[in-house]
C-alpha cells in the first residue's frame, strides 16, 4: 500500500499537490472544523481565525513512516489586528512539498476578515520542481454562543505547471450547547469533488482534559482526540480513520500567550 501511494503521487502529481490536510492534531480529530476549538493553526483553514500562541504538530500520514508531515504556526494579536505565520513540510526521498504562509486579519465588532498569502513549493525527484503563490480569504462572525465562518482557499485560481490548483470552500457553524460542550457542523467543497458534510463535538471533561470527536460524510471518516491542558500548555493526541488507508495518528503541542 505504501508503494501504491508513492506511485500515485508520481503518476498523478497535480492531484497530490496542495492537499487539504489537517494542520494539527486538533483538526485531525475534528475533521478540519476549526471553530469548535481555536488554535494558531486554524488560520490555515480560515484566515479570519485568531488565537495567540505557538503550535507545533507532527504525523506520519496514514501511519506510513516514509511520509512524515510537520507543521509550525505562530499567531499574535495587536489591538484589532491578528498576525499569523505558518509552515508545513511533507517529506519523502522522492516527493517533497512545503507550504509557507503569512496571515493578516482584522476584527470589527462581531466580524473578522482575514487573508493569507501562501508560498507552495513541490518537487518530485527526476520529474519536476515548481512553486506557486496563492491567496486565501476568510470571514468570521461571532455572537455570544454562536460563531459562523466561511473560507476560500486559492481565490486567485493560481496555477502549478500551467494547471489550476484546487479551490476549497469551507463553511462552518459552531454552537455552545452547555458551558462544557460545543457542536460544529460544516460543508466543504473542493474542485472536482462532491460536497463533504462534517460534524464535530467537544466536551470539557475537566479543566485538564478535553475530548473531541467528529464524523465526515463523503468520504466516510471518523476522528477522535484528547487534549491535556496544563496552564498555558496543551498536548493533543488524535486519530482519524480512512476508508481505504491506515489510521492517521497526530500529535500537537500548543503554548498560549
Protein language model annotation of sequence segments:
Residues 3-14:
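Sec-dependent N-terminal signal peptides
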Residues 17-257:
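Subset of outer-membrane beta-barrel
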